[in-house]
């Protein structure tokens, strides 16, 4: 069983982290091609393309200039301990044990606009490049076309080697669109999280993001390899009547 999640815009390169054996990203050549393309863009283009403030534009243009495919301890950190958005607050990776982090390394994948796919302990340098950005490169119209074949093949190979051949999709729709799920072996299950508000159950985006992270953390802390066991996630209640084979609905409230 493989679980996929999205990255985060916010990065933490300042807090202290435990010393753990780390790895390097799988698609460094492809990432460097993207960086070199980004270096050719004007600040005005970067700002409009990514909808950034002036300060964030300056920061990320500098990041592109400084970025190199070198992942030393001085300039990079493990991805799961660096991304810092709502999903990652849900995972609470800094409080995972060493054995839980090693389980994550084998069973969790992070989709990325710059790196394609990251293992949790792959070291990353500061960057910002969302999968939905329209960045034409190498006859590809956008990052979906650039990454889809590589990302899909990597996930397909890992699923083929897994016991349950099941992908748990906890990524956002922006990132999951990079995966051609028709070419994956086995099942793809997308958990949907709904909270009770104003008399009905509905997806509330911030809470749903956090819930995706909490479910990912639940999978890692319990060493789950059988998808049926995620139905026992104790922060939401699995709803059999509202679920289908591909979408599992979880309710709270």
Where do the protein language model's features map onto the residues?
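C-terminal accessory regions
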Residues: 1-2, 183
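Short hydrophobic beta-strand segments
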Residues: 2-6, 166-169
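Active-site helix-to-loop segments that bind/position phosphate- or nucleotide-bearing substrates
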Residues: 4-95
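Internal, well-folded beta-alpha domain core
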Residues: 93-253
């Amino acid at each position: 069983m493989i679980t996929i999640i999205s990255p985060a815009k916010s990065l933490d390169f300042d807090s202290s982290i435990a010393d753990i054996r780390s790895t390097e990203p799988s698609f460094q050549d492809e990432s460097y091609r993207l960086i070199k393309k980004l270096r050719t863009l004007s600040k005005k283009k970067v700002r409009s393309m990514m909808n950034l403030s002036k300060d964030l534009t300056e920061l990320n243009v500098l990041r592109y200039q400084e970025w190199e495919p070198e992942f030393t301890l001085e300039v990079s950190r493990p991805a799961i301990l660096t991304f810092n958005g709502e999903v990652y607050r849900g995972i609470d990776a800094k409080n995972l044990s060493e054995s839980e982090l090693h389980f994550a390394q084998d069973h969790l994948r992070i989709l990325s606009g710059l790196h394609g796919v990251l293992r949790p302990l792959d070291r990353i340098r500061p960057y910002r490049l969302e999968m939905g950005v329209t960045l034409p490169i190498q006859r590809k119209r956008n990052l979906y076309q650039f990454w889809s074949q590589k990302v899909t093949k990597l996930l397909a190979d890992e699923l083929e080697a897994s016991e349950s051949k099941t992908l748990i999709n906890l990524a956002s729709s922006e990132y999951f669109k990079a995966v051609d799920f028709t070419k994956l072996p086995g099942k793809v299950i997308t958990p949907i999280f709904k909270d009770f508000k104003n008399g009905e159950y509905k997806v509330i985006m911030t809470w749903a993001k956090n819930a995706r992270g909490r479910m990912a953390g639940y999978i890692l802390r319990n060493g789950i390899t059988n998808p049926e066991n995620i139905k026992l996630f104790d922060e939401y209640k699995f709803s059999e009547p509202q679920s289908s084979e591909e979408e599992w609905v979880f309710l709270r409230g």
